[in-house]
Amino acid sequence: MHVKTGDEVLVIAGKDKGRRGKIKRALPAVNRVVVEGLNIVKRHQKPRGPGRPGGIVEMEAPIHVSNVMLICPSCGRASRTGKRFLEETDHKGRPRKVRYCKACDAIIDK
């Protein structure tokens, strides 16, 4: 996936198109992400014991990863990302793979 937990993204399709948010949780098995404060749905929940009453609960639903675009931390624009290998190596001795912004060519990963 081109986004990770903690990235700031722009929603490019759907009912929240044009809104920004931070990724709360990534679900790579189903190619979806949960974005803070976006894609709010109402869930009718049954009571679950004495401490958890039932009712209509608002929660954030997952959005498909193709409907979000990463906002580059260096240039501040929503842009496509790519991956490249650096000269330095990771802990296993392999070249380190990082994401970069295709608009400004800055490395996104630390």
UniProtKB/Swiss-Prot annotation:
It comes from the Bacteria. It holds the Pfam family ribosomal_L24. The keyword RNA-binding applies. InterPro entries: KOW, Rib_uL2_dom2, Ribosomal_uL24, Ribosomal_uL24_CS, Ribosomal_uL24_KOW, Translation_prot_SH3-like_sf. SMART domains: KOW. Part of the 50S ribosomal subunit. One of two assembly initiator proteins, it binds directly to the 5'-end of the 23S rRNA, where it nucleates assembly of the 50S subunit. One of the proteins that surrounds the polypeptide exit tunnel on the outside of the subunit. This is Large ribosomal subunit protein uL24. It comes from Chloroflexus aggregans (strain MD-66 / DSM 9485). The lineage of its organism: Bacteria, Bacillati, Chloroflexota, Chloroflexia, Chloroflexales.
